[in-house]
Amino acid sequence: MPAIGILMVGRWMSNAAVRIEMVKMAKGREIKVTRWRHDPLSDDPWRPYGVRHQIVEHSDILLGWISSMESKPTDTVTVHMGTNLLEGDLDDRPRIVDQINRKECRDEWRQLWTDRFNEGRVSLMGKSLVWDIDDPDDLETAFETADAIASELTKHVAMPEHAPRVVFSGGKGFHVWIVDENAVQHLCRSLVGAEVSEMTAKKRAAAHREVIKEICQRAIGRSIHHLDQAPNHRQGIIRCPYAVHERTGQIVWPLDVDELERLRDGDGIDWSSPVALAKSIHPWEIPVQSPMAEALGVESTWIHPEASVKDRGMPTYG
């Protein structure tokens, strides 16, 4: 079978519905696009070849990046977005292009933003909270945990438009989002007694992580071993909804009400792998083997359900 790579990701990203929904969510936030190159002779057959950071203002940026990073059809790309909502001079916002060393890129990016924050050229306008739940050995348990967290959050967030959203990561777990800054501030006040609007970004991040832990404790009565707190760090990022997971070839998929009910019921749901679960959730087209998955010995098939992208419950960010 042909490979899922830049060309296939480009086809998905060039779809108008996909681009519009991604940019609605990512506008005013950090976007990180990473290109992965397949080198079968290397000890690590998959390595990042280029990393780009930017702030998204319109959909052509995303499509332009995918097009400009086009190389071998066996390469693939990933798209992450920041959990911070930022405001500042667009012309002065930092950008990094084609860094091969991910650590150097991360450190440089942090310094660029720190300088602008300290000088007052960029302001933190809000923060989304994300419960990132991974359980590669038991996707059903990962979903049950995510569903319990979302249920607990609805007890504390009254407005329907602020309700938690559950997203299948396309890989080994689920993300639970609280997007609205007012809802985040309310959770911080009511659960951990923190007035985050008056805090520095660093102290704010610490309060956010305490909220994450408190909700987990209330939802399932214990801490979660497979909970990743990285999205809630001061400059946290997470896979952008509707992006493609590079290792499985599956889409980061926001779950609508009907899909959530099907997963809760469990009838006809195949939890054996991310690919099988994706097939249970949404329509498929065009079977295509992922080169990264093939190298890792993992089943993978490309899916292309553009018609189901709109109105999936993920609100506009910002």
Language model: regions and residue ranges:
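Histidine-centered divalent-metal-coordination microenvironment in nucleic-acid enzymes
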Residues: 128-131, 161-193, 237-243
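DNA replication initiation on ssDNA origins
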Residues: 1-128, 133, 139-143, 194, ...
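Aromatic/basic-lined ligand-recognition segments
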Residues: 78, 186-191, 210-213, 226-229
